[in-house]
Amino acid sequence: MAKQKYERTKPHVNVGTIGHVDHGKTTLTAAITFCLAKAGGAVPTAYDQIDKAPEERERGITIATAHVEYETEKRHYAHVDCPGHADYVKNMITGAAQMDGAILVVSAADGPMPQTREHILLARQVGVPYIVVFLNKVDQVDDPELLELVEMEVRELLTEYEFPGDEIPIVTGSALKAMECGCGKRECEWCGKVWELMDAVDSYIPTPERDTDKPFLMPIEDVFTITGRGTVTTGRVERGKVKVGDEVEIIGLRDEIRKTVVTGVEMFRKILDEAVAGDNIGTLLRGVDRKEVERGMVLAKPGSIKPHTKFNAEVYVLTKEEGGRHTPFFNGYRPQFYFRTTDVTGVVNLPEGVEMVMPGDNIRMTIELITPIAIEEGLRFAIREGGRTVGAGVVTGIIE
């Protein structure tokens, strides 16, 4: 079968379903594909196709994730759904599936449950910026007052974790009823609710800023000298763009920030007018000595990112089966933290009342590195011991 060409006509947004086990995340995902398929915007994907999601390995961590795609009139969406709670935790911490917004599914019959809370907390911690709520299984609730009560509870919970609980769109419906009906019409009592949800997602979750529009950043992978021309750093542009004549800062591994000017940009030995996010390039730097730059530093737009040593993080600790530790670790644990292209030693401070961390746990912690690294909220990292990955984390707040 010939592959369809991906037409880049609509803005692209990444979303995902989150919420407590058995509240209907996967059924809703299926219902969205069925309803949108009626308007030619999706391939209908059945529950069991989504539920038996293949396991993927992201940085050595096994995560089961289902990916579906669909289109509304306004946008193209990539949607992730995970079968198990542990998969969500790993997914959100590793950033394996970046979400520009999440659809929180809450069963109207049960109200918010422990994983509802945990997923909202994780969304807040790892920087999922927007949430839209689908209050599911309303066919099982006869009392409209009960429905109002659940909605209020959900709004309060969202507010508790610093989401705008009063503004967040909440759509009520039944994913199962929409699936059973299958007409996919907007006028339909059940299918119409799925359309209402997609309208809310379309309007409430903004189109994310493209990587090329963000401030320039390139992690340095290699450094060499070209006789008579100067020092060249190579790497893949993570975001933004860079051209000859741009002023950049060299940040990380030293306390001071070094300013320089890009005097040449090359890609595959060819001279480039401008390099953009995703390009693997070499940059010639004015007046910089080979000894002043090393792998693990970054080139960045002046003022856009700072070197730090101390930060808070949300961390997932690999299980023994995933190749992680076989034993717990304690306060003062000193592994390597792998940021972008290099390892830096750091010390772990556990929250008060936490004695130890077991393989398979996810935990908030404070980390202090022995040398500064260019760090910002949302940056992902790996925790390593002797070259093997034992954990994955995301920076949730800078301390110093």
From Swiss-Prot:
Record EC number: 3.6.5.3
InterPro entries cross-referenced by the UniProt entry: EF-Tu_GTP-bd (IPR041709), EF-Tu_GTPase (IPR050055), EFTu-like_2 (IPR004161), EFTU_2 (IPR033720), G_TR_CS (IPR031157), P-loop_NTPase (IPR027417), Small_GTP-bd (IPR005225), T_Tr_GTP-bd_dom (IPR000795)
Gene3D superfamilies: P-loop containing nucleotide triphosphate hydrolases, Translation factors
Superkingdom field: Bacteria
GO molecular function, one term: GTPase activity
Keywords in alphabetical order: Cytoplasm, Elongation factor, GTP-binding, Hydrolase, Magnesium, Metal-binding, Nucleotide-binding, Protein biosynthesis
Compartments, record wording: Cytoplasm
Any single Gene Ontology cellular-component annotation: cytosol
Location of region: G2: 60-64
Binding residues annotated for GTP, in chain numbering: 19-26, 81-85, 136-139
G3: region residues: 81-84
Catalysis performed (reactions): GTP + H2O = GDP + phosphate + H(+)
Region described as G1: spans on this chain: 19-26
Binding sites annotated in the UniProt record for Mg(2+): T26
CDD domains named among the record's database cross-references: EF_Tu, EFTU_II, EFTU_III
Function description: GTP hydrolase that promotes the GTP-dependent binding of aminoacyl-tRNA to the A-site of ribosomes during protein biosynthesis.
Classification via NCBIfam families: EF-Tu (TIGR00485), PRK00049.1 (NF000766), PRK12735.1 (NF009372), PRK12736.1 (NF009373), small_GTP (TIGR00231)
Subunit structure: Monomer.
Protein name: Elongation factor Tu
Encoding gene (name): tuf
